[in-house]
Amino acid sequence: MDAASVSFGSGHDLSSQPRHDWTRSEAETLYNLPFADLIFQAQTLHRRHFDPNHVETANLLSIKTGGCPEDCGYCSQSAHYDSGVKATKLMDREAVIETARRARDAGASRFCMAAAWRNPKDRDLDRVCDMVSAVKELGLETCATLGMLTPDQARRLHDAGLDFYNHNVDTSPEFYGNIITTRTMQDRIDTLAHAREAGLKVCCGGIIGLGEQVGDRLGMLMLLANLPAHPESVPINMWNEVKSVPVNDTAERPDPIALVRMIAVARIMMPRSVVRLSAGRQYMTDELQALCFLAGANSIFIGDVLLTTKNPQTARDAALLDRLGIRSRLDDAKAAAPPH
């Protein structure tokens, strides 16, 4: 079967408007296309909705690290595991603003603030809202990931100037119970709905390499693509090994071609969403990242650290994008830098 012979019935084809009724068989058909056909379809749709030679650059800061009561089996910040990550208090406003300013000057267009909470307390949310407003004044897009939200909390974040709320589903509904027991998948879906109803854009994706099967990876994409509205940002994370967490017993970094196929299927199923090549890039070769961009990834995190794990150095990212002829805010930062 080649790309031209793919048929999904009901009048659907790969040139249709975004859909919300993807089936398992359709997802499997896409994933199993010959590699060249899959990449061709993904790149064709990518060009229809995005500049194929531009990548979004975001920066992620942990404003409150560790001590999280959730038992996510991959996470170094869970209080359930002896990962070596020390719990910290919520950062001061001025420290967050200064970090955001440096991120902007280094080439970030979006600044994401993460706190290791099950859900924010109102007194802490007051402080986060103040941070959001201040970061927004720097000319950056704002994103936050703070755990579960009530409808009122989502509205408060929106009113403070927050653009995006991140709350990942992590994996398929079927595999979910193998990695998390303290928060249900429905809890996550409810928080996404609260964010959407408050007027926030949604950032939602997952992790591959936790010990799941290909069917689980596709199930995660189906869950996202069949939401009432597609997430505006879809981060695809690759498992990062951290000390003393349960998934280390079964997790394995995915085959590189499998990662590219996931990116391509995400691009096809959610053609207007930004697909972020997220955690795990420090393990990827330049060639693998180039294939992911070709398959439809168009966002990365810049900065040497992602929460508690490493990330490629910004200079390496800038050099790679330059070699590929891909533009980003890193170009503006380079042009503005004083000569040596």
Curated annotation (Swiss-Prot):
* Function statement: Catalyzes the conversion of dethiobiotin (DTB) to biotin by the insertion of a sulfur atom into dethiobiotin via a radical-based mechanism.
Region (Disordered) location: 1-21
Q: What class of enzyme is it?
A: transferase
Complexes and interactors: Homodimer.
For binding [2Fe-2S] cluster, which residues are annotated in this chain's numbering? C112, C143, C203, R276
Name the catalysed reactions: (4R,5S)-dethiobiotin + (sulfur carrier)-SH + 2 reduced [2Fe-2S]-[ferredoxin] + 2 S-adenosyl-L-methionine = (sulfur carrier)-H + biotin + 2 5'-deoxyadenosine + 2 L-methionine + 2 oxidized [2Fe-2S]-[ferredoxin]
Q: Which UniProt keywords apply?
A: 2Fe-2S, 4Fe-4S, Biotin biosynthesis, Iron, Iron-sulfur, Metal-binding, S-adenosyl-L-methionine, Transferase
Gene that specifies this protein: bioB
Instruction: Report the SUPFAM superfamilies cross-referenced here.
Output: Radical SAM enzymes
The cross-references to PROSITE patterns, in alphabetical order and at most eight, read:
RADICAL_SAM (PS51918)
Q: Under the GO molecular function aspect, what terms does this record hold?
A: 2 iron, 2 sulfur cluster binding; 4 iron, 4 sulfur cluster binding; biotin synthase activity; iron ion binding
Organism this protein belongs to: Nitrobacter hamburgensis (strain DSM 10229 / NCIMB 13809 / X14)
Q: Which residues form the Radical SAM core domain?
A: 53-272
Q: What is this protein called?
A: Biotin synthase
Name the Enzyme Commission number(s) assigned to this protein.
2.8.1.6
Question: Per its Swiss-Prot or TrEMBL entry, what cofactor is needed?
Answer: [4Fe-4S] cluster; [2Fe-2S] cluster
A Pfam family reported for this protein in Swiss-Prot or TrEMBL: BATS
The entry's [4Fe-4S] cluster-binding residues are: C68, C72, C75
